[in-house]
Amino acid sequence: MSSSQTYDLPETNLQTVLLLEADNEFAATVKKFLELYSCRVTRARNGVEGLQQIIRTDFDVILCDMVMPTFPGDKFYIAVERIKPRYSERFIFMTGHKADPKWDAFIRSVRGLTLWKPFPMHDLLTAMRTVFRRSRERDVVDYSTVMTGALVTAPKGSFPFSKRMTIQ
């Protein structure tokens, strides 16, 4: 008998995700999963490709593998922090090198969210919710109502989770 769990998925409010991952199979799995709940995923195979994407496009979340050819995750983060500082809190780091003191020290120094490979996809959803929640808390916009003059506060780019998906 298999056990199944149900996870909330976002409405069709399209979220943009930059996925930096050198492993083709893993990247395809993550991309397909995220597209199931209306995320637009752009993949970069290394930090150089990632920077090109960051310059051209805005992203709601950045999934960043730490070990990539040409330009590893820590160097990519530092470069992004310089050109688009507001993106520094949109990172979710992914690595299979849990015992590596270099990656551990870096991730701790930037207070990064981390997914240790292999990870269950619901952990990815949880991490993304955390990034979106932080973004909403930081980007609260004030709207004044014309009819009543009342002040209403609402988050920009909300990420509602009302669809449901069962993973067995």
Language model features with spans:
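Two-component/phosphorelay signaling modules centered on CheY-like receiver
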Residues: 23-42
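Active-site residues of response regulator receiver
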Residues: 65
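The feature encodes the CheY-like receiver
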Residues: 69-70, 99
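Alpha4 helix (beta4-alpha4-beta5 surface) of REC/receiver domains from two-component response regulators
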Residues: 75, 97-116, 122, 126
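A short, hydrophobic beta-strand element within the central beta-sheet of small alpha/beta folds
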Residues: 88-99
